[in-house]
Amino acid sequence: MERLVKGDIVTLNFPFSDLSGFKKRPALVVSTLRGDDVILCQITTKDARSDEYAIDLSNDNFIEGKLPRNDCLIRVNRLFTGDKQIILKKSGKIKKQKLDEVREKLKEIISN
């Protein structure tokens, strides 16, 4: 797999919050750590607009690649640290402005 950086959109088997299983879904790379770990935010196509931490994501927000659907949400409060080996493929990269929006929302979550 090619080198991953902040802002990359990847596809992986994302675990359920209760760790009872997983589902193949896209995620946003928010940090790459030493070794083979990355920190990711879940991306969903389900209606999570009631989630105050969700950020709209459309194909207009990409500088390369795209998602199969154009009405997605980045679930900034759904973080996951995983080994790069679980990543199935790189799907694209979001624009700096959208990544900055995610960073600001992460700061808001952490500072509360």
Range-by-range predicted roles:
Residues 63-112:
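C-terminal terminal-subdomain/extension
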Residues 20-23, 29-61:
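Compact nucleic-acid interaction/catalytic patches
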Residues 15-19:
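Short, charged beta-turn/beta-strand-edge "cap" motif at the junction between a beta-strand
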